[in-house]
């Protein structure tokens, strides 16, 4: 798919596959699933599985495949993110590089991060790997109880990349 076609095909149903590429079900359209999602995958109760829950670990946009794996695998974790359009309540970042805390999900405890600004965006390195940080969601930055600002997540740096069969 080219970019425009990719936008359309993410709405189309397709195969749900495990990390080996084995088809284990069908999905309703990639746009309806997020990294780390466990519910609503339509693959529970598989006899061949380990009995652990299935989680979304990636999306193969080129082939319209939803990639899932059982259990808490490294593919669910990332070490950093990029946010290209951060906004700060004060009007500007506190410094070119600074330490603060961040939240990536509603009601999540604060997580220690180092923010390195580049233009209106930043690379945000996590103190420890974080589970299911997802492009399209927001990162919100804090100094104690004070909200510094935030913005949409554009990319994440995975702790362990998906196998090459999903990225070439």
Task: List the predicted regions and their residue ranges.
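Hydrophobic alpha-helical segments, especially N-terminal targeting/anchoring helices
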Residues: 2, 17-18, 142
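Single conserved hydrophobic/aromatic residue that forms the stacking wall/gate
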Residues: 1-10
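Short loop/turn microsegments at loop-to-beta-strand junctions
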Residues: 11-13, 137
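Active-site-adjacent loop/helix segments that line or gate small-molecule/cofactor pockets in enzymes
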Residues: 27-46, 100-111
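Short, solvent-exposed cationic patches
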Residues: 39-61, 162-168
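Short beta-strand/strand-turn micro-motif
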Residues: 17-32, 50-56, 110, 133-134, ...
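Basic, glycine-rich polyanion-binding accessory segments appended to enzymes
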Residues: 59-148, 153-168
